[in-house]
Amino acid sequence: MNGIVIVDKPQGWTSQDVTARLRRVYATRRIGHGGTLDPMATGVLPVFVGRATRGVEFFEHAEKTYETLLLLGRTTDTQDVTGATLAEKAVHLSPADIEKVLPRFRGDILQVPPMYSALKVNGKKLYELARKGQEVERQPRPITVFELTNLGFDGTRLSLRVKCSKGTYIRTLCQDIGDALGCGGCMEALRRVRAGEYDIEDAVPLEQLLESE
């Protein structure tokens, strides 16, 4: 097979897990994915098969759109709910407080990459250092948030839709918004609903693809 398969990645799978299983389904070693998703994230994961793998490097630069749930009042070492709690604060915010802060995170901004990431410093991946309890200085990197929409706020959880450039960490965006609101926060859920020209409506659940394994 030569082509692109749009997978709806389930929670708990790494992007590499998905491609490893699909190698068996399509009986080929030439397979790659566009845009890594963390294990806790779900949604659009384009998988390039056969000659189509040439397109992976170009696709990496595509804009991505996510829907995320920000849990306010809790800060963790991984910037999401899977991590160890570093701080907890009571949340006393109004919808107006939210709308006052969100504009700071739209447009061209600088973002400090998280320690729990695959970025390398002096040849070592940051998450490897983080697991050893080490923290190193990271330089802020320019990103673009094209859209940041409040989908709902229940007093402690803020649902957001984010359209952003390559290299944007949604976990970090969640924590930074929580810090700006004065109570801290971490990412509770993440779903990629669009990657480049591929929409979640185009995606096939992974379990459906594995039925032919």
Predicted regions and their residues:
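Catalytic/RNA-binding core of pseudouridine synthases
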Residues: 1-213
